[in-house]
């Protein structure tokens, strides 16, 4: 008698799983140098097969069985365990990552590079300075901008560096396709000024050599995570820790007065008001508030496009706080406000634009960068774009020991700075560039040393309240003699070695003169260490100069010559963000030097500003429109990928070396000193009997050559033939730009001396349509 055996569905499936196991004997290791089939299992494991060794892959739709048959006759069988099948073309390592631009900046270096076909991400390494070997930078520092990628290495001490870009496919580095660029000169931030005077350590989270302080923490903030980023913060003096979420909420933990661990907040891309978790100050925006402790906090932008739009930054009751390398647009009131009970604070390399138009004297916003209730402060290397009221220094509160240096007052109107009460105020090496109202304003018993600044078409370079140019020497109508500063008492100015051109009026003190011994805008000295006589006092208030700048304990500093200030401030290492930021606007000096109204075109562009950032490689959720990361799916045994795209503009410079690996320059450099497209370039390739540049483009381009006018050459030879195209000279920039010359893919070009010696400063290749 036959017995029947009944099995449950569960038991049956168990037996099937036991007796129908996968049979896998022919899979190979992942190899990016050959075409492969990728079989991904439900478990997440991947089995790889070289397509040249596979004759077929068969799928049974009834049982979900997959069979991989090899050309040698063997087969691997997967019994319902396959999740997906994909095909991966080999990576063409004959074409390495194309670096289109690489430069050192201030305590950082960056590299721009084209997409590498097949790469899902990149690893970037830096070597030099504190890094004896190539050291990987944080993945958050690698971003896509659609037409190109960018990576920034940050926290570098001064020195020469190299960077290496390695494409990554499926979390595996393709080292054969890596590209290295070297000779990237990194300089230190200039730390001269009162912020660092008698400071016990570096201002912010960095030491004075540009490296991070011991134990420093870093958080990265973008629109993708400004509300969700979290960090553990100390909240009482017993060591209690609290996890705070959202960037404003994290910073608010400092109000407990106990958190002092160094922290760097690195801002990536554009942050709008709606992106923030909250804002601690309804009037200003992001509030950085302590309780008088050394906070060791730096807020800095990554690259050239970090921007706060719709809000600014308020710093209150803080010590050792640093703001650097970001832009502020369309803020509610002040752009930056150092306000109340701050010490040793520093704001530098910021781009500050219009605020919200609230009419009247707030049509361009309120203060761009105001300092109130603060001691030991430096405001340096900032770019002010047509600001209405730049730098209020005291609103009647106690402000002292403040330095303003290397700022670019670009068509801004007034308050550069406007000073009350401060007895130790140093203003030097600033570029006053087309200012419609006045430069430095001294009131209420203040003492200001104004040194080695460059004034171009600044209406009144210096004013003292109720005397001199401020009231037309007391002569004229009531309007002429009213004054600028609400009838406040005067402050006194010592001036040394300033350069002025195009001003309406500047009246220096003249001893014994009936008018100019009373009505003067500044006391001008011939020697920096000359002291002002005690009898020199302001007409209203009777304030004399305290000669603070000649005291033995005055801080050490190294000023630039006044004549060099425009080139320094507008140069590559100059004012504003890295690369002068991602927003550019050219002022028409003929109309804007004297205009103090809002420029509607500029205002509209700022309102409409949008970031070109597409993707942060470690944050897939950054954008809804980021490039896909799927693997290519060619036919079995398909062709190799096309050579990598060179669709972006290629720019190469020769400041001591070629900035692009495509170009080989003879080591024959000379000083050209040009300003091209807003960037200052010092050196170029000297085309004499020794100089040459050789390159082979991988696609067709239109080539523009830029020569320095310091040498007579206005043409070159290309492969032995003299160029015949004409060009245009830019006297202000000191360069001669040839009209475009066509170059063809896969052809070697050698550029040498033409009719006369020349200095080739820059080559720009624009892809042909």
Outline where the language-model segments fall.
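Ser/Thr/Gly/Pro-rich low-complexity, disordered linker/stalk segments of secreted
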Residues: 24, 29, 75, 623-646
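Long, contiguous C-terminal flanking segments immediately downstream of a protein's structured core
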Residues: 90-113, 117-121, 125-132, 139-140, ...
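Surface-exposed, short loops/turns at beta-strand junctions within beta-sandwich domains
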Residues: 152-160, 741-745
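Extracellular beta-strand/beta-solenoid scaffold signature
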Residues: 279-287, 309-313, 330-339, 359-371, ...
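Right-handed parallel beta-helix
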Residues: 295-305, 319-330, 342-358, 367-368, ...
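Glycan-recognition and processing domains
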Residues: 640-690
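Short beta-strands within extracellular/lumenal beta-sheet-rich domains
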Residues: 678-699, 713, 735-737, 757-760
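Short, surface-exposed beta-strand/strand-loop-strand elements in extracellular ectodomains
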Residues: 711-723
